[in-house]
Amino acid sequence: MVYGPHTQADRERMLATLGLDSVERLFDDIPPAVRAAGLDLPAPRSELELVRELQALAARNRVDLVSFLGAGVYRHHIPASVDAVISRGEFATAYTPYQPEISQGTLQTVFEFQSLIAELVGLPVVSASHYDGATATAEAALMAVRATRRQRVLISRAVHRHAVEATRTYVTSPSRDLAELPTLEDGSTDLAALEAALADPEHPVAAVIIGQPNAFGILEPMARAAELAHAAGALFVAVVEPVSLAVLAPPGEYGADIAAGDGQPLGIAPAYGGPSVGLLACSEALMRQIPGRLVGRTTDLDGRRAFVMTLRAREQDIRRDKAASNICTNQALCALAATTYLATLGPHGLGDVAATGAAMARRLEDALAGIGVQRVHGGAYLSELAVTVPGARDVHGALLERGILAGFELARWYPDDPRLRDALLLSCTELTTTPPPRRPIPSERPCPSPRAPRRAAGCRRRS
């Protein structure tokens, strides 16, 4: 196939075949009033001139900011091994590994991704990846609807708003609905409201969806919420932040049937909100309901270890109306980045990342309290906290001029909540390298310690 541009002789030959005397005649059907009069393109540049112009544009980017921005997308140190691995030509491809005999490397990396995420969340079945945390959460809701044959989903108001809206889009129909659960003064989900909603005999619930930590950074009573959901015959879905699982209990430990989350913190740099990788895991009882791809390990005819795609319940493989998902792709390269990141850090390294972010958040809270800035919510948190700052938008802009990215304005997500009108959500990670003046961390608010590595069912232990 020739990729060279058409020559003038080529164009004249095609126009002659069409019976036209100019290219402009091809657009005669477009009314002149809406037709472009011409393209105001700059003069051609040499490669050197173009590089200099792009460098000048790139120099306008602010990369020297002290950032407290999180709200679902987080800046972490990314080991050099991550880019080294994902840049290899064997992996940087759009090819789907349908032919296992020539795709063992790609299939093995997906299997390793599934194994590592299974160990992290404490659930045995993990999909090969999804677009992002929002679509993974929405798919979890549909899994629950199919498994329970119920038509109502309850989701906490404190789940990330992107996940809430994606789930609403997926779930809502004339026969199904999504209801939001309110939050308490401490920022956690109102379990009394949850219990009342579950007790409604007219609207049996398929799933209860709660985030850990939630969108305010608050730690939720997940075990109790799971207990209430199961008592009413509903499934419990935990929406998790993966780095936090190095120090918090995994979803499988407190009874979650499904875990969803966004894998961006695992070795993927923030870039205008993407790319990312959706995490979705479930119990063995729900294995047939999980959408997307699964990679399994088997043996070939010669008895050698082999990796293959298995249990493919996608619309490309079975009848569309029976398919578990109509998503026809995944985020394999981003999943490989997450795999490399986790393998490089190991459980204790990941625990250090989570614990450092938590310690920095407590130092930030103490420093802000010293100048009269208080938290919005009183609940326990890990490394993200909401604070009240009168005139938050103006303060945010003023600090940005001074090289400080002062978090996320929660009023953008909750415009009708007066408590959040002047609230900034501040996040700390190990890259919060310019901390406020240090104060002793009170003993009643200790920084979490990394939890001991756990081995999920069907997964190999990692060192």
PLM feature spans:
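N-terminal entrance/gating region of PLP-dependent enzymes' catalytic architecture
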Residues: 36-112, 318
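Compact, charge-rich alpha-helical regulatory domains located at protein termini
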Residues: 1-36
